């Protein structure tokens, strides 16, 4: 009985919304660049996209069921907005030593299986996700490029249905990017990220 209670408690903690204090970026902050290894073996940074109007930075992973549930929607966001100047940049923040299945080889396999149209980067040393303040996978930061600086315009969830894409009624990230493309601020600038905790030792 006690074992079952512990399992249920662990499951609840794993998936509950991110409510802890965010030590990273807030809306309006300027995000610093990074250089991280991609699944294709190359290093990728935001500076590699000089023509971009901004970025959809998604902290996601291989093993979280919420991240897996969002994969097709993340692909759709990239397909919808990449040619309009807002490409998706996916970053796996998990320490593979803390969670099996998050190794670069597994990331490469997953990217190939799902035919990711965007970079899938490994946060080696887990230095980038704390800068952003990501606490869950998935956790999204929409950046708007202004005067050569990447300003945070939206933080949080992709939409309002973490489990079922058919039940989405609020498309937070898409709405934010569409507003930025019109030269406007997003009506909704921050939501709670719902997903799995980031794994670290």
Roles of regions detected by a PLM:
Residues 142-201:
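Thiol-/selenol-based redox modules, centered on thioredoxin-like
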Residues 108-152:
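Short, internal strand/loop/helix patches
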Residues 16-47:
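N-terminal "domain-start" segment that seeds a small globular fold
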Residues 68-113, 124-131:
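Structural microenvironment flanking redox-active thiols in thiol-disulfide oxidoreductases
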Residues 1-21:
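Bacterial Sec-dependent N-terminal signal peptides
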Residues 45-68, 177:
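Short active-site neighborhood of thiol/selenol oxidoreductases, capturing the structured segment around
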Residues 52-55, 84-88, 114-119, 137:
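Loop/turn elements at helix/coil->beta-strand transitions in domains of secreted/extracellular proteins
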Residues 62-63, 93-98, 162-166:
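Second-shell loop/turn segments in exported
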């Amino acid at each position: 009985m006690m074992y079952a209670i512990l399992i249920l408690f662990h499951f609840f903690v794993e998936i509950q919304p991110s409510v802890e204090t965010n030590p990273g970026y807030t809306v309006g902050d300027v995000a610093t660049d990074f250089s991280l290894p991609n699944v294709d073996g190359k290093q990728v940074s935001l500076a590699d996209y000089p023509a971009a109007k901004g970025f959809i930075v998604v902290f996601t992973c291989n093993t979280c069921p919420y991240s897996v549930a969002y994969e097709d929607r993340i692909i759709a966001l990239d397909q919808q907005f990449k040619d309009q100047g807002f490409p998706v940049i996916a970053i796996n923040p998990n320490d593979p030593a803390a969670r099996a299945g998050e190794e670069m080889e597994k990331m490469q396999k997953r990217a190939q299986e799902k035919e990711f149209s965007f970079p899938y980067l490994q946060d080696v040393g887990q230095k980038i996700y704390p800068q952003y303040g990501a606490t869950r996978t998935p956790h999204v930061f929409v950046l708007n490029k202004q005067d050569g600086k990447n300003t945070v315009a939206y933080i949080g969830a992709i939409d309002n249905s973490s489990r079922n894409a058919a039940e989405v009624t609020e498309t937070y990230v898409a709405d934010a990017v569409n507003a930025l493309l019109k030269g406007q601020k997003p009506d909704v600038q921050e939501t709670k990220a719902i997903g799995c905790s980031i794994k670290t030792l």
